[in-house]
Amino acid sequence: MNIGLALIPSKSFQDEVNGYRKRYDTEYARIMPHITIKSHFEINDDELDSVKEEVKKRLEGFGPVDVHATKASSFKPTNNVIYFKVAKTDELEQLFNLFNTEDFHGEAEHPFVPHFTIAQGLTSQEFEDIFGQVELVGVDLKEKIEELSLLRYDEEEDKWKVIDTFKLA
């Protein structure tokens, strides 16, 4: 089973991000707007309950996190991916660090860059055109997220689904 952890914003916040994703993101139908906290990792089906218990344990005393998407940015030249950059707060960094350790299914492959992807799967020309447009429009989305979501990849439907949520209280 392929699972991961993410912060998923409210429907209204998702609608704002999806306004761009519908047009520019080849993965739009596979996953909702999110901030990845723990990238996908593989477990056996019988390990799911212990993973859930470990997530609960690690989140003890951890409160809601403020999310502020401040501008369009990109991973170019590494990838032609455009995203809304989220201000990296101590709380977001701490949350990421709680779950990206050897004793919880391994270290992160990449440094933590909190963001909402809005465009991917682009040619270089598409990237240049779209990035210029999105950068001019700007973004200022704020929200307090009060739960961490556990997602599972559904191979039959070729999409990620929330299978559990954990209160940040």
Curated annotation (Swiss-Prot):
InterPro entries, alphabetized: 2H_phosphoesterase_YjcG-like, Cyclic_Pdiesterase, YjcG
EC number(s) per entry: 3.1.-.-
Motif HXTX 2 mapped to chain: 115-118
Keywords: Hydrolase
Entry annotation: catalytic residues: 34 (proton donor), 115 (proton acceptor)
GO molecular function: hydrolase activity, acting on ester bonds
Transmembrane regions listed in the UniProt entry: none
Motif placement: HXTX 1: 34-37
HAMAP family named among the record's database cross-references: 2H_phosphoesterase_YjcG
PANTHER family according to UniProt: PHOSPHOESTERASE SAOUHSC_00951-RELATED, PHOSPHOESTERASE YJCG-RELATED
Family assignment from sequence similarity: Belongs to the 2H phosphoesterase superfamily. YjcG family.
Annotated protein name in UniProt: Putative phosphoesterase SH1944
Organism: Staphylococcus haemolyticus (strain JCSC1435)
Species classification: Bacteria, Bacillati, Bacillota, Bacilli, Bacillales
